[in-house]
UniProtKB/Swiss-Prot annotation:
Record keywords: Cell membrane, Membrane, Transmembrane, Transmembrane helix
Membrane-traversing stretches: 20-42, 57-76, 81-103
One term under GO cellular component: plasma membrane
Location(s), subcellular: Cell membrane
Source species of the chain: Archaeoglobus fulgidus (strain ATCC 49558 / DSM 4304 / JCM 9628 / NBRC 100126 / VC-16)
Protein name as annotated: Uncharacterized protein AF_2393
Membrane topology: Multi-pass membrane protein
């Protein structure tokens, strides 16, 4: 059975993708896509008041846009999409922290700070 990059063996594919994308960029893209998909779902559930949250659909839309940008980076295998999505996530996270400090309204966008180490690593290159 083949994978998305044409390798027949999964281990060979993983090794190939890690070497081709500069040491794990594709793995980071998959991880960020999954993480922000989860944050988007949680924000939507919070906005619909399923479990008593204070989220808004606008925040869910922004998280969905960040998720789509990470997913586009996975599909086209470009670092630039990951960098831009990480910048968006970090900026949105800082904004959500300021909103939380001002009004006490919690948003799952605060967890976008997990992209900062990736941004620092890319900025040093």
């Amino acid at each position: 059975m083949g994978c998305i990059c044409g390798h027949l063996q999964l281990l060979g594919c993983l090794r190939h993708c890690l070497n081709r994308n500069g040491g794990g960029t594709l793995v980071v893209a998959f991880a960020f896509t999954a993480f922000f998909s989860l944050l988007t779902i949680l924000e939507v559930l919070s906005a619909l008041n399923i479990f008593g949250g204070e989220g808004t659909l606008m925040n869910a839309f922004v998280l969905g846009t960040i998720t789509a940008t990470f997913a586009k980076g996975v599909v086209v295998r470009r670092d630039s999409y990951l960098f831009v999505a990480s910048l968006l996530a970090a900026a949105f996270s800082v904004l959500m922290i300021l909103v939380y400090m001002a009004s006490g309204s919690f948003s799952y966008g605060i967890f976008g700070l997990v992209t900062v180490p990736y941004l620092v690593k890319k900025a040093r290159k």
